[in-house]
Amino acid sequence: MPELPEVEVSRQGISPWLTGIKVTRVVVRDGRLRWPVPGEIQELVDLTIHRVSRRAKYLLLETDFGTAILHLGMSGSLRVLDIGTPAEKHDHVDIELANGKLLRLNDPRRFGALLWTREPAEAHALLAKLGPEPLTDAFNADYLRERAKGRSTAIKTFLMDNQVVVGVGNIYANEALYAAGIHPKRAAGNISAERLGTLVAEIKRVLAEAIRQGGTTLKDFTSADGKPGYFVQQLQVYGRGGQPCFHCHTLLSEIRLGQRTTVFCSHCQR
C-alpha cells in the first residue's frame, strides 16, 4: 500500500506537469473504485489546476472552483503520459491536459478513489478530522506527549491512528520505533517525554529519507515516471522477521499487532 512517502513522491512527480495547466477532458473508463467516481468530476474540465498538494495520503488537485481528491488505495499509481497513449488493464481514469499530457490512474485492486468537492478540501469529511502532518512543526514532542497522556494503547497502534498523526503507516512505524529503541507494544502513556522526543525525531527522519529515496517499492508502488522507490534497501526491520538485528544480531521478532505485521528487536527495543 502506498504510504505517505510514496504519495508525496507521486505529488512531486506530477505537480510540474499539472500546475498552471487547464484540464481539457476527463475520461472515466471504469468508475467502480472504493467509492464510485462521481459524475461531478466532469466539473474539472476547462478548469486550471493551480496547485497539487497532499493531505495525509490524499492528493489534492486544487482549482478556483473545487478540488479533485485522489487516493491511491492499496495498489493505485499515477503516471504522466502523452495524450493518445493506449490504455492498459486497470487504467481506470485519465485527466487530459492542455499541454498534451494526461494524468492516468491505474488501480488493479480498486481501493483507490477520485472524488470532487466544491467546498474547501480541508472541510471534506475524509480530511476534516485528520491529525497533523508528521513533517511539520505541529507534530512535535509536546504534542505527542499530550496526546499520549493516560493512553494504554500500544505505541505502534497509537502512531498509526490518523487522528493522532497522519501518514505513519506500517512500514515507517516499524522503522521509526526501531530507530528510537521503543518496543511497539509499550503503552503510549508509559513512555517518557525524552523518549517521545526521540521518537518524533526518528519519525521525521525516516519519512524524510524515504521521500528522498523515492519511497519504498514492495509490490505495487512506482513513482509518476514509472521508477521504483529505493528506501526498501534501507529497511532495518520491516520484512526482516526472523533475521538478525543489524545492531545486536538478536533474531528479530515478528508478531501481529492491531492486525498488522510488526517486526522488532527484543534486545534493542524496550
Swiss-Prot record:
Top-level taxon in the UniProt lineage: Bacteria
Segments forming FPG-type zinc fingers: 236-270
InterPro entries to which the protein is assigned, alphabetical: DNA_glyclase/AP_lyase_DNA-bd, DNA_glyclase_Znf_dom_DNA_BS, Formamido-pyr_DNA_Glyclase, FPG_cat, MutM-like_N-ter, Ribosomal_uS13-like_H2TH, Znf_DNA_glyclase/AP_lyase, Znf_FPG/IleRS
Gene3D superfamilies, per database record: 1.10.8.50, MutM-like, N-terminal
Sequence similarity: Belongs to the FPG family.
Function recorded in the entry: Involved in base excision repair of DNA damaged by oxidation or by mutagenic agents. Acts as a DNA glycosylase that recognizes and removes damaged bases. Has a preference for oxidized purines, such as 7,8-dihydro-8-oxoguanine (8-oxoG). Has AP (apurinic/apyrimidinic) lyase activity and introduces nicks in the DNA strand. Cleaves the DNA backbone by beta-delta elimination to generate a single-strand break at the site of the removed base with both 3'- and 5'-phosphates.
Annotated protein name in UniProt: Formamidopyrimidine-DNA glycosylase
Organism in which the protein naturally occurs: Aeromonas hydrophila subsp. hydrophila (strain ATCC 7966 / DSM 30187 / BCRC 13018 / CCUG 14551 / JCM 1027 / KCTC 2358 / NCIMB 9240 / NCTC 8049)
Gene responsible for this protein: mutM
